Amino acid sequence: MNESQNESWHREPRKIRIHDESCFEYMRKAGLLAAQTLDFITPYVLPGVTTEELDRLCHEYISDNGAVAAPLNYKGFPKSICTSINHVVCHGIPGERRLSNGDTLNIDVTVILEGWYGDTSRMFVVGDKVKRLAERLISVTYEAMWKGIKTVKPGESKGGAGPNQVHGSPCSLYFLCSESIV
């Protein structure tokens, strides 16, 4: 680790910025579009479909709704959404791999609408074959997400939600590293 990396590792966590009411409507619109994109793509998450096709459909949906897909060309990222299949923890790049019955797939959607970001993701089980371990991981991480959301308050540091959401929950069986659960 070089000196600048070492310094950034130890800096104080930034506080959550408190916005006024005029900003909330923009945040809601961007977040809603990101969520609607996941609702839109849900019926297409089927065995035999490629993640490239899911990316194309999401890109068109986001563009047709007046927004930009934030990941596209961000630090060279080549796609409009992130698709993480099975053991890929996060930020997988859509491609020609066909989804199989029983795959787990996380689709991460980030949009920019009127200058505001909306970012969300959803975990899918492809087809009707669910592996018990995958079902358990999905269940406990969903629980951890809601525990973390409940800890977020104005004036709190951004780094506090991660440890708080897993302590004492079934998620403590998994490892939390940065923004990923492995």
Task: List where the protein language model places each region.
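Active-site neighborhoods and metal-handling regions in enzymes and metal-associated proteins
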Residues: 1-182
